[in-house]
Regions:
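Double-stranded beta-helix
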Residues: 1-6, 12, 93-132
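Conserved hydrophobic/aromatic beta-strand scaffold that supports enzyme active sites
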Residues: 29-33, 51, 75, 83-85, ...
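Short acidic-glycine-tyrosine-enriched beta hairpin
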Residues: 65-92
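A short glycine-rich, His/Asp/Glu-containing loop-to-beta-strand
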Residues: 3-49, 107
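Structural motif
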Residues: 39, 51, 58-60, 91, ...
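Glycine- and acidic-residue-biased ligand/ion/polar-headgroup-sensing regions
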Residues: 47-67
Length: 132
């Protein structure tokens, strides 16, 4: 498993991600590294759920159970060795609001763990750090 950790990185404006292991189309394990003062977009998934394990750093997670993702936005903070579950269809955003790198192990599971199932939305509030 650790040999696969050295796979190719996909770079984004917020940092990078790499697939550690893939088990068909229904389960995938990735590492996400989020740069300081950066975040992923406000998004949800059609076909999968996720569990995030904080490997290094402090994660700030915004989420909403609202179908449209614009009401009742909650915020939680997770530190090393803590986890957060993101349910299928749940609006969410992973942010690194610190000055140190954030590393997350993401376990995706569901009917289809493909990147194209991401649905992004305009920000529900203007004070988030979101990027693509």
């Amino acid at each position: 498993l650790l040999d696969k950790w050295k796979t190719e990185k996909t770079h984004r404006s917020w940092g990078w991600w790499s697939v550690i292991e893939s088990y068909g189309k229904t389960c995938k394990i990735k590492e996400l590294v989020v740069n300081p003062k950066s975040s992923l977009s406000w998004q949800r998934h059609e076909f999968r759920s996720e569990v995030w394990f904080v490997r290094k750093g402090t994660a700030t997670i915004y989420y909403s159970y609202d179908k449209e993702g614009v009401k009742n936005v909650f915020k939680t903070t997770k530190v090393e060795k803590q986890t957060q579950r993101i349910s299928r269809y749940q609006w969410h955003c992973l942010a690194n609001e610190t000055n140190k790198e954030l590393s997350i192990i993401e376990i995706q599971f569901g009917d289809d763990c493909r990147e194209s199932d991401i649905i992004r939305k305009q920000l529900p509030r203007g004070d988030y750090l979101f990027s693509d």
